[in-house]
Amino acid sequence: MAREREGRRRDDREERDSEFVDKLVHINRVAKVVKGGRRFGFAALVVVGDQKGRVGFGHGKAREVPEAIRKATEAAKRGLIRVSLREGRTLHHDVNGRHGAGKVILRAAPQGTGIIAGGPMRAVFETLGMQDVVAKSLGSSNPYNLVRATFDALKNEDSPRSVAARRGLKVSALQARRRDADPADTSEAAVA
């Protein structure tokens, strides 16, 4: 009976792992100086997501590459964050993020735009499940800083529901204001 339970637990863990997509962002050879010389190892940066709005990143170090990747993947799964997506495909509004000397600007994009982002940011958006976004990185191009800056920006994003709750309004009132301020609607009003 204990074996049955143990087997079921393992199956659940494998099922949970299969829902995640992981991307290796960066691998680096590192050296530890010891009495007899240098001891080489590897450091891996991995981004993990379920392509439904949850994403995390992790850093792992080990003597062998596969072990470093495994450690980084486990760390990424422990640090997942949830990001609210508009229509399940893009951001609700433009956001900025920063970590160290790495700065990123993320902009919501119309349907069909695709992921316009470079390197480490693209991996974050693909594992997150975002389909339309325009991103620009400024400053440092260090993958660690860019991934952390991207996560900082994603954490700064507010959904209309959270903004409405903070202001004591209904979501429909916020979205009505958004439609009133839309430049496409004002041009039609000027023609009429």
Curated annotation (Swiss-Prot):
Gene Ontology MF terms: rRNA binding; structural constituent of ribosome
BP terms from Gene Ontology: translation
SUPFAM superfamilies: dsRNA-binding domain-like, Ribosomal protein S5 domain 2-like
GO cellular component, one term: small ribosomal subunit
Region of interest called Disordered, as start-end residue ranges on this chain: 162-192
Pfam families: Ribosomal_S5, Ribosomal_S5_C
Keyword annotations from UniProtKB, A to Z: Ribonucleoprotein, Ribosomal protein, RNA-binding, rRNA-binding
Domain S5 DRBM: 20-83
InterPro entries: Ribosomal_Su5_D2-typ_SF, Ribosomal_uS5, Ribosomal_uS5_bac-type, Ribosomal_uS5_C, Ribosomal_uS5_N, Ribosomal_uS5_N_CS, Ribsml_uS5_D2-typ_fold_subgr
Functional note: With S4 and S12 plays an important role in translational accuracy. Located at the back of the 30S subunit body where it stabilizes the conformation of the head with respect to the body.
Stored HAMAP family: Ribosomal_uS5_B
Family indicated by similarity: Belongs to the universal ribosomal protein uS5 family.
Comment block on domains: The N-terminal domain interacts with the head of the 30S subunit; the C-terminal domain interacts with the body and contacts protein S4. The interaction surface between S4 and S5 is involved in control of translational fidelity.
The protein's assembly and partners: Part of the 30S ribosomal subunit. Contacts proteins S4 and S8.
Protein name: Small ribosomal subunit protein uS5
Name of the gene encoding the protein in the UniProt record: rpsE
